[in-house]
């Protein structure tokens, strides 16, 4: 059984960003909330939208920060402190440039890879990077100078379908993660091939 108590989906707030690649983490948390019929509600003390799920008999909180991406740690730290959740009990879902659309991978710890949301969370958790990550592939524009425009752009329909398929599989694997363990969830998710 997993000890995950908080699942966070990273995003920028506002309608203009809702469909951009940088919000892939929030798409995952939204899909998870829908799958368990527990809609997210805004909770200002946690600087985000929150919900509470019973996942495989365990109490799990969901959070989509309403801060901008580079301030995500404020929301994560507020919720973690309030509910006494340790970094290794947190799963952060985020967009990943180094994976292609249609691929999602789980990992524990590591650096921020230039991702401003992860950077701020690590900082606000007392420079502790040892939380779980769900990396949702969005692909790379091929040139470092194009990254900002790329992550703040909307994927074409063909890529969106691949990203959605990977997110749906990640939702299914979250149940495996909670019921069994990280290794089983990783094995299934990492073997996934989009149609």
Swiss-Prot record:
GO cellular component, one term: cytoplasm
InterPro entries for this protein: Pept_tRNA_hydro, Pept_tRNA_hydro_CS, Pept_tRNA_hydro_sf
Catalytic activity: an N-acyl-L-alpha-aminoacyl-tRNA + H2O = an N-acyl-L-amino acid + a tRNA + H(+)
GO terms of biological process kind: protein quality control for misfolded or incompletely synthesized proteins; rescue of stalled ribosome
PROSITE patterns (alphabetical): PEPT_TRNA_HYDROL_1, PEPT_TRNA_HYDROL_2
Record's keyword terms, sorted: Cytoplasm, Hydrolase, RNA-binding, tRNA-binding
Protein name (record): Peptidyl-tRNA hydrolase
Organism encoding this protein: Pectobacterium carotovorum subsp. carotovorum (strain PC1)
């Amino acid at each position: 059984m997993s000890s995950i108590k908080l699942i966070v989906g990273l995003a920028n707030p506002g309608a203009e960003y809702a469909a951009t690649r940088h919000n892939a983490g929030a798409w995952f948390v939204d899909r998870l909330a829908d799958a368990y019929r527990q809609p997210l509600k805004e909770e200002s003390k946690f600087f985000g939208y929150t919900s509470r799920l019973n996942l495989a008999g365990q109490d799990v909180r969901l959070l989509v920060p309403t801060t901008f991406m580079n301030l995500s740690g404020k929301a994560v730290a507020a919720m973690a402190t309030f509910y006494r959740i340790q970094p290794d009990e947190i799963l952060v879902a985020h967009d990943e440039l180094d994976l292609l659309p249609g691929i999602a991978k789980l990992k524990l710890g590591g650096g921020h890879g230039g991702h401003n949301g992860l950077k701020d969370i690590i900082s606000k958790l007392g420079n502790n990077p040892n939380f779980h990550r769900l990396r949702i592939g969005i692909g790379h524009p091929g040139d470092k100078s194009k990254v900002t425009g790329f992550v703040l752009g909307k994927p074409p329909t063909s890529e969106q379908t691949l990203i959605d398929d990977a997110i749906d599989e990640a939702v299914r694997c979250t149940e495996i993660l909670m019921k069994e363990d990280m290794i089983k969830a990783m094995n299934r998710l990492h073997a996934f091939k989009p149609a």
